[in-house]
C-alpha cells in the first residue's frame, strides 16, 4: 500500500483553493507579528490551555495510506481545539464564514484530536485577532467525530489522484536512480572525493562547507550524490541555490546529462517574478492582470498536464504552460515545485525573510537537502536580505499624492511616520552630523511604520482605481520588509540614520547574519555550502552560520600548476594616497604583460574612477593596443557585446578594463585562447565607508578580527575570483599579474591558495617582460 505524508495546511490549501492572485490581499501577518500574538493569546487563555500541540493521523482512503500531520495552536480542557488567525481586516467585516479555509483546517485538527483522545465530539474555536485595534473575535462550532471524519475523508479523496500520481512517479524515479551511474567516463581530480563527501553529508543529515576550485566539476559533484541519496530515501528534495542565472543553467545542464543516462527526475527552475512576468508593468491584481484573475480555478488542470509531460521544467516550459492556461508564470513555477524532485533557484527563496518559499518552509523543517553554490556571494547578500531601509522621499511622495479629504486615516498614519523623521532629522542637525548610529531600535519610529502597514492593508483594496495606488503599494511593501526585519533586531544590528542629497534614510543594518542563516539552514535536514573560493574556510563557516563542529573540506586545483604563470609586482603601491604617483608604473606593467604575447587580457581595478584614469593614460601612452572598458550599469546586451570581442582568432591583442568584484570578474568563462592573461591592480579593499567600519567595529568587539572580516578577506576573495577567469580548462594556459606591494605581505600570502605557492616576485617592467616572454616560449 502506498504511503503519503502531507500536512493539514497543504492538504486544505491544495484541495480547496480558488479565485485570484491579489497582491493587495497578501497575507502579511507573519511578517508583521510573527508568533508574538499567538504566544500572547495562548498565555492569556489560562492553565487549561495547552499551546502548540502536534497532531498526527493515519487514514486509508482509496488504497492510499495517508499520514496527516499538523500543529494546533491550542487545546482547551482536552476537548476544545483553538485556531488563532491574525488579520488586519476590520472586525465588523469578520463573520463566521470569513475564511472557509480556516474552518477546514480547524475541522481537520478537530478530527485528529477526536481520534487521538477517543472523543465523540469536539468544540472547534476559531479566534481572530485584529492587529491594528488589538481586538479578539471568536466563533465556536461543535462537530461530531463522524462528521469531521467524513469531511477529512472527502478532502483526502479529492487528493487521491495527486497522491497516486506522486507515488507512481516516486517509484519510477527511484528505480532509475538505483540504476544511474556517474554520467562521465572518468572522475576529474578531486571529483569523486567531493561526491562521496556530499553523499555522506546528506545520509548523515549534517552540514558541509567546501572549497572546490574551478575544474573539479562541483555542480555534478553535488547534484549526482544528492540524487543518489534521494533514491535511497535519505532526502525528499534537493534545492540548488545560486546567485547567478548562468550557474542555474549549469545545474540544468548537469540534470540533463543525468537524464541522458536514464534518470527520471523532475526539476524546476524558478525565475524572478520581475523577469518572468508577461506584463510590461507588473501588477498582481485580478482587475489588472488576466494571468492573476481566476488563477487558482485553472491551476490544477495545468499542473496535471505539466506533470504528465515534463521533467525538465525550465523557464521556457513554465512560460509555455502559463500562456496555454492563462496563469501567472511565477506562481505556476512555485506551485509545480511542490511536485518536483530538484528545485533550482536564487538564494532568497530560502534565506530572505520576506520572499522565502513559504509553501516549503513556513511549517518548519523538512527532509530537504540544500546545495548552496557560490557562497562567497552569500555574505553580502545575507546582510542585504536581513537589513531594511525606508526613505523620507518615498513617504513624502505618497503624502503629496493623497487627497486629504478622502484619505484621512491613511494620511494620519503617514504624518505620524513623517513626524518621527522630522525629529530624527533635527537630531542630526543638532549633532552637526550627516550620519547617526545607535544600537537600540527606534521604538516610536518602528511603531509608526507598523501602524501604517495596518492602515494601508485596509486602504489598498478599497482604492484600486486611485492614482496613488502604485505609490502606496510601494511604501506598503517597503514598510512590510522594515517591520519584518525588526523582528530579528538584536545585538547583531544597528540602526543608522543618514541625511544625504536632501533625503533622510533610516536603515536597520544587519552586521552579522550568521545566526539567521543557521536558522534557515535548519529548515533542511542536510546542507552543502560550496564555492571555488572560500579562503579562509573558517571565516566563511563563521559568517554563514556554520558551527564549530561543522565539517570543512578544501580541495586542490585539478589543473596543472605550471599552466598559470603567477607574477607579483610588489614594487608598485596602489594604496589610495599613492595612486596618482604610481599610475604610470601601473600602466607600464600592464603593457609589459599584454605585449608579451598577442591575445586577450582582462585588467581589474578596485573602482570605476581608478579604472577610468588608468584606461585614459594607457590609451594615451600605448595606442597600438586595442582596448575597451566596462561601463557603469551595463545592460545584458552590452555585457554580451563586451565579451563577444574576446575571440580566439583576433588579429590583434585586446585588453578589457574591468572593475574588481563586478560582472566580469566572476561567472565569465573565456576558455582557451579567448583569454590568455589577467592583471589585478590592488588587493581588492573596498573604499573606507561607514557601513564597513560598523562591521569592522562589530567583529573587533566580538572576535578581535574587524579589519580581516570587514575589508581584507572580502577584498581578497574578489582577487581570487578575478584570477579564476584565466584557467578554465585542462589545456588552458595564461599569465596572471598581481600589482600591489601588499601581495608580498604575510597577511595576504596566508590567503593564497595552495596552487599559488609558485608565485614569482617581479621588481620592474623588464622583469615582467622577461617572465612573460619566457613563459610563452616554453609552452
Enumerate the predicted regions with their spans.
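Metal-dependent nuclease catalytic cores that hydrolyze phosphodiester bonds in DNA/RNA
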Residues: 1-80, 100, 104
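Mg2+/Mn2+-dependent nuclease catalytic core
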Residues: 57-152
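Conserved pre-motif I regulatory segment
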Residues: 168-211
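A substrate-engagement module of RecA-like helicase motors
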Residues: 174-175, 181, 234-343, 351, ...
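Walker A/P-loop
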Residues: 203-225
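Signature of the SF2 helicase/ATPase Hel1-core->accessory helical subdomain module
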Residues: 222, 249, 325-342, 347-451, ...
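A contiguous, basic/glycine-rich beta-loop/short-helix subdomain that forms a polymer-engagement track
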Residues: 318-343, 354-361, 458-573, 581-582, ...
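Conserved RecA-like P-loop NTPase helicase motor core
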Residues: 570-581, 631-743
Amino acid at each position: 500500500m502506498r504511503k503519503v505524508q502531507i500536512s493539514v495546511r497543504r492538504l486544505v490549501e491544495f484541495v480547496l483553493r480558488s479565485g485570484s492572485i491579489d497582491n493587495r490581499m497578501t497575507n502579511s501577518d507573519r511578517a508583521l507579528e510573527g508568533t508574538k500574538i499567538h504566544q500572547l493569546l495562548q498565555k492569556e487563555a489560562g492553565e487549561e490551555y495547552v499551546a502548540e500541540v502536534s497532531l498526527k493521523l493515519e487514514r486509508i482512503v482509496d488504497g492510499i495510506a495517508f499520514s496527516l500531520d499538523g500543529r494546533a495552536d491550542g487545546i482547551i480542557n482536552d476537548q476544545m481545539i483553538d485556531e488563532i488567525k491574525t488579520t488586519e481586516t476590520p472586525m465588523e467585516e469578520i463573520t463566521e464564514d470569513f475564511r472557509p479555509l480556516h474552518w477546514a483546517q480547524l475541522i481537520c485538527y478537530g478530527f485528529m484530536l477526536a481520534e487521538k483522545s477517543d472523543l465523540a465530539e469536539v468544540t472547534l474555536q476559531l479566534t481572530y485577532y485584529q492587529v491594528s485595534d488589538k481586538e479578539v473575535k471568536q466563533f465556536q462550532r461543535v462537530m461530531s467525530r463522524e462528521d469531521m471524519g467524513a469531511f477529512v475523508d472527502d478532502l483526502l479523496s479529492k487528493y487521491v489522484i495527486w497522491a497516486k500520481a506522486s507515488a507512481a512517479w516516486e517509484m519510477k524515479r527511484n528505480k532509475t536512480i538505483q540504476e544511474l551511474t556517474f554520467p562521465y567516463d572518468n572522475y576529474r581530480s578531486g571529483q569523486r572525493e567531493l561526491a562521496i563527501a556530499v553523499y555522506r553529508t546528506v545520509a548523515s543529515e549534517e552540514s558541509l562547507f567546501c572549497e572546490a576550485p574551478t575544474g573539479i566539476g562541483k555542480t555534478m559533484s553535488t547534484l549526482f550524490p544528492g540524487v543518489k541519496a534521494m533514491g535511497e530515501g535519505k532526502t525528499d528534495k534537493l534545492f540548488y541555490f545560486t546567485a547567478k542565472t548562468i550557474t542555474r543553467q549549469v545545474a540544468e545542464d548537469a540534470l540533463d546529462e543525468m537524464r541522458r543516462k536514464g534518470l527520471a527526475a523532475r526539476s524546476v527552475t524558478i525565475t524572478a517574478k520581475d523577469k518572468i512576468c508577461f506584463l510590461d508593468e507588473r501588477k498582481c491584481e485580478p482587475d489588472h492582470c488576466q494571468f492573476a484573475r481566476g488563477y487558482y480555478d485553472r491551476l490544477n488542470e495545468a499542473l496535471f498536464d505539466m506533470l504528465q509531460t515534463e521533467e525538465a521544467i525550465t523557464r521556457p516550459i513554465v512560460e509555455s504552460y502559463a500562456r496555454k492556461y492563462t496563469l501567472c508564470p511565477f506562481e505556476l513555477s512555485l506551485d509545480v515545485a511542490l511536485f518536483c524532485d530538484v528545485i533550482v533557484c536564487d538564494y532568497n527563496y530560502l534565506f530572505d525573510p520576506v520572499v522565502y518559499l513559504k509553501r516549503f518552509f513556513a511549517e518548519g523543517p523538512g527532509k530537504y537537502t540544500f546545495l548552496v553554490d557560490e557562497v562567497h556571494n552569500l555574505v553580502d547578500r545575507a546582510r542585504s536580505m536581513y537589513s531594511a531601509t525606508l526613505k523620507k522621499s518615498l513617504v513624502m511622495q505618497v503624502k503629496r499624492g493623497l487627497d486629504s479629504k478622502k484619505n484621512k486615516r491613511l494620511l494620519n498614519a503617514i504624518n505620524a511616520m513623517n513626524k518621527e523623521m522630522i525629529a530624527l532629522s533635527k537630531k542630526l542637525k543638532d549633532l552637526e552630523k550627516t550620519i547617526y548610529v545607535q544600537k537600540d531600535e527606534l521604538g516610536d519610529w518602528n511603531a509608526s511604520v507598523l501602524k501604517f502597514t495596518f492602515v494601508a492593508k485596509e486602504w489598498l483594496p478599497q482604492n484600486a482605481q486611485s492614482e496613488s495606488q502604485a505609490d502606496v503599494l510601494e511604501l506598503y511593501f517597503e514598510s512590510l520588509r522594515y517591520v519584518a526585519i525588526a523582528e530579528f533586531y538584536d545585538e547583531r544590528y544597528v540602526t543608522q540614520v543618514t541625511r544625504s542629497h536632501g533625503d533622510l534614510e533610516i536603515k536597520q543594518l544587519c552586521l552579522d547574519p550568521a545566526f539567521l542563516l543557521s536558522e534557515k539552514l535548519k529548515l533542511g535536514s542536510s546542507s552543502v555550502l560550496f564555492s571555488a573560493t572560500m579562503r579562509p574556510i573558517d571565516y566563511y563557516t563563521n559568517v554563514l552560520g556554520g558551527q564549530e563542529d561543522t565539517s570543512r573540506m578544501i580541495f586542490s586545483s585539478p589543473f596543472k600548476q605550471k599552466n598559470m604563470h603567477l607574477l607579483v609586482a610588489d614594487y608598485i603601491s596602489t594604496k589610495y594616497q599613492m595612486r596618482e604617483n604610481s599610475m604610470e608604473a601601473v600602466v607600464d606593467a600592464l603593457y609589459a604583460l599584454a605585449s608579451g604575447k598577442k591575445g586577450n587580457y582582462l585588467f581589474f581595478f578596485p573602482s570605476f574612477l581608478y579604472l577610468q584614469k588608468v584606461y585614459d593614460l594607457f590609451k594615451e601612452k600605448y595606442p597600438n593596443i586595442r582596448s575597451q572598458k566596462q561601463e557603469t550599469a551595463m545592460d545584458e546586451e552590452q555585457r554580451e557585446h563586451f565579451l563577444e570581442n574576446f575571440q580566439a582568432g583576433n588579429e590583434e591583442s585586446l585588453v578589457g578594463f574591468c572593475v574588481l568584484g563586478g560582472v566580469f570578474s566572476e561567472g565569465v568563462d573565456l576558455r582557451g585562447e579567448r583569454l590568455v592573461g589577467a592583471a589585478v591592480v590592488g588587493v581588492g579593499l573596498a573604499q573606507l565607508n561607514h557601513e564597513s567600519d560598523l562591521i569592522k567595529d562589530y567583529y573587533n568587539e566580538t572576535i578581535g578580527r574587524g579589519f580581516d572580516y570587514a575589508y581584507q578577506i572580502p577584498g581578497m576573495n574578489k582577487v581570487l575570483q578575478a584570477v579564476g577567469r584565466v584557467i578554465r580548462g585542462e589545456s588552458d594556459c595564461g599569465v596572471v599579474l598581481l600589482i600591489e606591494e601588499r601581495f608580498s605581505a604575510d597577511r595576504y600570502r596566508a590567503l593564497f591558495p595552495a596552487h599559488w605557492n609558485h608565485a614569482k616576485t617581479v621588481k620592474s617592467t623588464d622583469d615582467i617582460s622577461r617572465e612573460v616572454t619566457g613563459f610563452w616560449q616554453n609552452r
